[in-house]
From Swiss-Prot:
Keywords: Cell membrane, Lipoprotein, Membrane, Methylation, Prenylation, Transducer. Residues 72-74 form a propeptide. It comes from Bos taurus (Bovine). This is Guanine nucleotide-binding protein G(T) subunit gamma-T1. The lineage of its organism: Eukaryota, Metazoa, Chordata, Craniata, Vertebrata. Retinal rod outer segment.
Length: 74
């Protein structure tokens, strides 16, 4: 997709672009923010038991666990 410098466009072209964008946006389904937040909260809470950031990673399956023993140079 080519980059368009908006300053190089005529006023008519700018208005046409705006109308095209508004035509795209008018077809989008809109929802109340309160309803979306409620659904999002429910979604997160339903899956929190599977989330490793919430429940943690078992020590035996943790790929980032520090290896025991090492070389100490004195």
């Amino acid at each position: 997709m080519p980059v368009i410098n908006i300053e190089d466009l005529t006023e008519k072209d700018k208005l046409k672009m705006e109308v095209d964008q508004l035509k795209k946006e008018v077809t989008l389904e809109r929802m109340l923010v309160s309803k979306c937040c409620e659904e999002f909260r429910d979604y997160v809470e339903e899956r929190s038991g599977e989330d490793p950031l919430v429940k943690g990673i078992p020590e035996d399956k943790n790929p980032f666990k520090e290896l025991k023993g090492g070389c100490v140079i004195s």
